[in-house]
Amino acid sequence: MLAAVQRTDRKFSLTYRAAIQPNPLFQFLCASVIVFLSVGPGFAQSGASYTAQRRIDTITVDGNLNEASWFNALSTSVLTLWNGSPAPAALQTTAKLVWDDQYLFIGFNAQDSDVYATYGGRDPNCWEQDVFEVFVTVPGTTGYIEVECSPKGVIWDGYFTNVFQGLGGSYNLASLQVAGHVNGTLNNPTDSDLGFSGEIRLPFSDIYQGVSGGHPTNGTQLRLNLNRINWNTPATPGGLGAAGSDTYYAWSPVPGASVSFHRPANFGTVTFTTNSVPAPTWQFTGQTLADTNLVFSGSGHPGGTYWVLVATNASLAMASWT
């Protein structure tokens, strides 16, 4: 059996492990998720597009994205600045979406050299610190749910009957699960982090509340956006991030006179397919792994990351990978 570990350096070590499975560790950022629901004339459609496949194994929401479902799931394009301008190379953000009959799963990876998050509890002002967001709406409706996830896995969630109208943060999704994982140290601007990742399990019962159907079928579409707010750690951690350090990113750009992610007309479109995510496959030929500290170079992936494959016993051998 094998594990896969994401790295950003150009060399890595192979080690043996017992009882491991395909395990891509994404460097992900936690942010907030906004899901759009509606019952009315609906919002005009434009923006990015994505095809969500069905999961192939049980997803434990712990922020690590170490299930086989995540390994070969389609990746979104890199989030841009909110107005569509390219994001800085050091702040790249991507996400993957998979689903089953009950839940939409969203996994994300955010590069960040200074991860900042101090808030705890339920429904703090997560947008004042590093956070990941998702916006989703049922086509033909006008309501939406907003869920925010911090790098610590702290949740802010709310329901809106229309843009900025409704229950806001007083509404809690009963079956929502969110988790974050920091690849570095929180709230320490003196070192250099790699970023943070996160997983969100969003129940279709909340997305489709008041709408017939209950969950997607093959070809069903939802309107959705994925957003990130980045802050640097202030001199005294706690509360709002460092003044003037905030930047805003969106999968489907939301241009306007000022920053606002609450522009459903600019959301992207997610189309659901009943096709499952392809199972991970591995090819082992040639050199036998006989050393627990064998170092060699690997080929790069987009964004400067690549996967380290780890064999569980020396009888397996690897020649190359992609």
Language-model segment annotations:
Residues 13-18, 30, 34, 69:
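Extended rod-forming repeat segments used as scaffolds/tethers
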Residues 24-39:
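Bacterial N-terminal signal peptides
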Residues 277-322:
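Short, composition-biased motifs enriched in small/polar/acidic residues
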Residues 1-25:
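N-terminal secretory signal peptides that target proteins for export/translocation
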Residues 40-44:
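Sec/Tat signal peptide C-region and signal peptidase I cleavage site
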